[in-house]
Amino acid sequence: MHFLFFFANRQFLSLKCPQAEFVWIPHPVHGYITGKFIQEDYGGTSYCQTEEGESLSVACAPSQLAKVAKSVLDKSVDDLVQMDDINEAMIVHNLRKRFKNDQIYTNIGTILISVNPFKRLPLYTPTVMDQYMHKVPKEMPPHTYNIADDAYRAMIDNRMNQSILISGESGAGKTECTKQCLTYFAELAGSTNGVEQNILLANPILESFGNAKTLRNNSSRFGKWVEIHFDQKGSICGASTINHLLEKSRVVYQIKGERNFRIVATELVKAPPRSRGGGGSSPARPESFKFLSQSGCIDVEGVDDVKEFEERVLCHGQARVRVQFSEDDINNCMELISAILHLGNFEFVSGQGKNVETSTVANREEVKIVATLLKVDPATLEQNVTSKLMEIKGCDPTRIPLTPVQATDATNALAKAIYSKLFDWLVKKINESMEPQKGAKTTTIGVLDIFGFEIFDKNSFEQLCINFTNEKLQQHFNQYTFKLEEKLYQSEEVKYEHITFIDNQPVLDLIEKKQPQGLMLVLDEQISIPKSSDATFFIKANQTQAARSTQLRGGEDSRTDFIIKHYAGDVIYDSTGMLEKNKDTLQKDLLVLSESSKQKLMKLLFPPSEGDQKTSKVTLGGQFRKQLDSLMTALNATEPHYIRCIKPNSEKQADLFHGFMSLQQLRYAGVFEAVRIRQTGYPFRYSHENFLKRYGFLVKDIHKRYGPNLKQNCDLLLKSMKGDCXSKVQVGKTRVLYRAPEQRGLELQRNIAVERVTIQIQAGVRRMFARRLYKRMRAIKPVLLNAIKSRSLSVLEQAIDAAKDIEFDMKLIRDCKELRSVILKEMEITKKLTDYIGAPPNHKTYLQVEPLYAQLCAVLTEAESINYSTPLVETGQQIKYMIAQRVETREQLKQAVDGAVRVDLEAAIARAEQIGLEESEPTLAAGRQELQRIYREEELVAELLNALAVGMAMRTSETTWDHAAIDAHTLGSAIYAAESFGFRTEQGRLTLDEAKVIVEVRQHLAADDYESLSMTLKKATTTLNKNSMSQSTKTEIDEAYEELSHNTAVNDLIEKVVQAIQDHDQEMLDYGVQQADSLRITDRPEMMQATELLNRIVNARALLREGITNVDQAQLETALADAASFAYTREEVPTAQQLLDRIYVINHDADVGLYYMEKEPLERAWAGAQEINLKTAQIDEVRNVLANDEQKFIQEQLKTANRLGDQARAIRLNIKLKEIFFGQFGKMFVFEQFGGLRKPEDFAKAKLLGREALKLGMFKWTKSPIPTSLTTLDQLAVKSATRLFKNVLGFMGDRPLPYPNALAQDLLEQCLAAPELRNEVYCQIIKQLTENPSPQSVTKGWQLMRCCLQTFPPSEEFANCLEMFLAAKGKDDKYIEMLHDTQYGDKRTSAPNVEQILAAKQYVTRIDLNQSTQVDTSVVPQGFVPEKLIADDTEGVIRAGSRPAQARAQPGQQAQPAGAARQQAAAPVQAAAATASYDYGQQQQQQQQGYDQQQQAYGGGADYGQQQQQQDLPAEPTEEYKQVEVVYDYDGGGDAQRLVLVKGAIITVIKEYEGWAYGSTDDGQVGLYPINYTRPI
């Protein structure tokens, strides 16, 4: 491809270019590219070839092509002044290279170049901000924070107002730079009243009303000058905003592809009805409004308008409260915007009056809507928009009708006026909320964010004003950077190199000069001339500016267009409509109508005016120039700092750098000249006096050698300084000037000296505070000692109150408080005892005190708990003892009477007599009476037993009985006597029951009534206790049974055997033969015949019966084989076969279930075995496994998973065990009691003021940064923790910071890189979710929790507390699933994308707890029974969050305590832990117990952490333990429950296990340790 490129800057193309050397070739897209010169033609055109082989032609001689220094192409320089090879091409190349590396900021000395990346970069997090605040700015990369910091430091050091001028074309990123500067100031110099938050929170509201979507970007359509006020301490104390040139014409007209202001275009139409105020009837579709639909652009791609409205206007409650916007203000504001929209819908139709054209409103319903919203008369409104009142001096006012076009203009003017005044009111309202205190002495930093240079297809009055503003700012930059620079060097008589720059003063004269009239003045003049028009303006402008043909010339349309040569390029302006846009006057009668409105906000916007104010004409151009002059005056009174924003491409595309487009912006911004002047000039300068003040102290005692001449003093100081940094410093007539290298050297020396002095000052202040505290402690010590010695409550109270300001935790203060508590308790006990037993010596008797026995016991227990003993307490103990004896004796008597036991009753009566219980006592009288009754009952029992011993039937042979000897009458008489008396003793009742049964048996036998006898004997079986029967009763019942059985059996057997012989019923035959033998009837013919038949099949039947009865697999197989040998096919054979098949299935299920330890096959096997009564060793094991509770069963599954190497299953089971454990002991893991947290007192001490509030709110939501970390961290990590908390605040919206997702991303990346911060961040999120009053903040907090849970796990120690918090507060179980996935899944090495996490609608867990185990039956051995695992080597129980167990370790290695050792250790360890925990808080003991229980839940015994010994521990056990010496160092493997061993230490052994032991060290630490690291002493 060949093309001709004309390059204008010939000054750059000045280096001689030999042939075949690499040169910079001008390029229309990339600016410059590298290539080689090929040849030159006769016309002076050079032909080159790029490195990619592309041919290019350049209209210049070869000598004008700059040579490429290839050695520096790979360098990336962050300060263009420091470049070795400086030219346009190298500067553009350097910016492009840095842009590709996301290094969007580059310095030109103190000027910052900012290239818009069109994407989010992690450059604005609190961590980055903190680095710029706490490090030397020159050591940090270029950044907006550097500029802001320079401005702030200069304001503090010089006490001079500063300004930051942010310039660049539209879309270059000026507004973002402004936000970053304001955010930095808010963080660096935060106020006590939170005004800095007002500044940040007000910004979105201003953007809603002042930003709009343009063809290029979504940009500010107004300029703002934000002045931040600082008090004498450097803290923000107020702020103000001045708005410039709101583009109010956008309200009524937008060019194609652009939108109305954001609040108008989206936030009203798409807001819920409650935000529309009186405009609730507004159509919901934006197409219904002309002011929204005329440009054809309603929606913006990638922007959620409804969400934006909710966030910026409705839901940002914090912003509305801070800037003092009420709900009425919002509703009134929405009413006015709705009225503006409906004004745009007025449709005017033409009519004919008396020789004039008239107009009327076609859609009068719109007039009614607007009138309702504005609270004005509809008829008056319609009249005033269709006609105007003409007032001529000396004549009556006349109403003149308006044409449809004029009526539309009048309506548009009203809409613009309302919106413009509404915006001014908004700014005023915001300023009032941030106004500094009256009379306060302040310094300011102003930040200017104003519209960038604009060149559109159609440019009108708005673009002329905007570009005029940019010309002014460019002139300010030129004056400060170039003109004033050279002027200063000349006045100071310093050598310098002259720099040529683009001077835009002629363009400013063209626009604003008075003679000849500039374009703005011509516009103003034409407004006051009758019958003037855009055409007359165009003619007059060309006439007055004919002499400035270089800056102004005609356009393509010579009747309307003119071209101005701006510093940023030629702009074609269309004069059509300029006159009307410049008028900015509202028709008088519309103004009067507006002033008559009853709408609250309209009354404020249009207050009643007086006199000629109603008719005064103030042009928009005139207002604008006045504002601009005021702005320039303010800027000129400040020390400026510059940020030049560059737009790298017009497509707003990330990672796309158009070199030529950027090159043009750099040229117009004066960047290249700034680079050269910074290199050749002296950017750093001080007056002689200030130079001496700033650096004079670097040379000791130099002031003693000073003379009256300040210049000579400066020379003397520079010559006396060490090093060569002062050799190139220029001392001018009034100033000292020098370049960047000298500045760095001087500042380095000064910083070192200041730091040294600062350290000395800090040490002195700390020493002073320490001495003051020591004096207060010494002064309070005797007071505390006397108070303790006095044991006087009032004295103690006074001493404690006197010591309340002592910050140090003195033991004497603790002792006083403890003694006060003891004395208060003693007083309480004494008062209660006096109430109960009376004051000495008039004590009550124990009979009087007995009703208060329970209360007396309680108060004496309290006295015992504090070892409180006095005569009164001892008397109470004696009375308590006496009462207790009486109470116990009464209860003993009552129980003995109720039980009717003679021995107990006699003992109770004896005790009552011993303690002197009164005979009138009811329980004693009842006892004596019952004892007499028992004596009589025993006599009757003896008579009854005698009657039972005689009168039973006599056996005459083995099969016959004699009934003649039966006697039932005597026994019946004895029964009658017993029932009449009423037996109560147990022996009496049992004997009576026996007698009743026996008398019935005798009666039935005597009558040969065997059926009744059978029923009586059955009843005896249920009513009589065989073990307590008398021997005679047992004998008589047995005999009756035998007689009954024999008689029944003989008859039944003969009948059945006869039938069995007929049917060849083998089972009945077998039964008959056996019964005949027992009945002694084997010699009867029927039985002999049956025996002969039975012998034929008895063997086969016996085998089958045995196999089926025993459910024995081997017996069944043998019996079936035997039956098959002689073809026996009765029902036993198929039954046996079915049973054998079932056994095969059950055994297979048992094999699979035990091998894989899966419940389903185990339950099938057990159910089948129960059903058929199968009993084997394997089935016993199945029963034992299933008999375990859920926890124990999962432990067995966990062992199996480790045996099979199924890590995924082991993790799932581990989680289930945790769930069980938390169900039992979860309450012990309270977040506030996590051991890694700081104590609230320590947390509060990190701040000098407000400590009590900090202590109480340590675990509650706050909108302020925290003074230190929530967890115990080293000092370096504490700083990171406090910075990360700002990320949390910013993401949750509790503190306005830009780019919340970037804050979350930064937090995730830092926590991945620094594991020690992970617990801290989780604690911070939990803190911010606790008692948070904002639902939006809570939602964002859980989003941040979700991001963290999917990125990094907490520590093992904190995981339980976090999981319990998620279970209690999380909306669902997904948070716990995320935690488990992160704990047990693959660890991340890089942070996930926050936006992707938040965009995910559903979380898919990686660990499915319900996932079934994959079973391979081919590997299962038959008859499998799991062996008991050897605990020290093979157990694989994985603890939650811990590493798998290792094999036993050799010395120097780490090993996991075996499960068996843990289980055996449980009891003694618990006892030792209880001793070590004495004097600890209750919660600590519960939490320790919880950890122990958790370890048992995971299949092991309790792992116990190190327990610190406390004062006044109980005495150690007297049992002697053996001791061992440590021979190898052991670090505990990172497990806090094990001892850390140091070679040579002595351990007292409490208990030994397989490979491990439990013991205590000399300093009181207790825990497990490996035996092979020690040797016996």
Swiss-Prot record:
Gene3D superfamilies, per the entry: 1.10.10.820, 1.20.5.4820, 1.20.58.530, Kinesin motor domain, Myosin VI head, motor domain, U50 subdomain, MyTH4 domain, SH3 Domains
GO molecular function, one term: actin filament binding
The keyword Glycoprotein belongs to this UniProt entry's keyword annotation: no
Entry-annotated residues carrying N6,N6,N6-trimethyllysine: 119
IQ domain sequence ranges: 755-782
GO biological process, one term: cellular component assembly
Region (Disordered) location: 1442-1466, 1483-1516
Keyword Iron set for record: no
Ligand binding (ATP): 168-175
Domain MyTH4, residue spans: 1261-1401
Domain Myosin motor: 75-751
Region of interest (Actin-binding), residue spans: 628-650, 730-744
GO cellular component entries: cytoplasm; membrane; myosin complex
Pfam families, A to Z: Myosin_head, MyTH4, SH3_9
Biased composition (Low complexity): 1444-1466, 1483-1497
PROSITE patterns, per the entry: IQ (PS50096), MYOSIN_MOTOR (PS51456), MYTH4 (PS51016), SH3 (PS50002)
Keywords of the record: Actin-binding, ATP-binding, Methylation, Motor protein, Myosin, Nucleotide-binding, SH3 domain
SH3 domain boundaries: 1519-1577
Assembly description: Myosin I heavy chain is single-headed.
UniProt family annotation: Belongs to the TRAFAC class myosin-kinesin ATPase superfamily. Myosin family.
The name this protein goes by in its record: High molecular weight form of myosin-1
Organism expressing this protein natively: Acanthamoeba castellanii
Organism placement in taxonomy: Eukaryota, Amoebozoa, Discosea, Longamoebia, Centramoebida
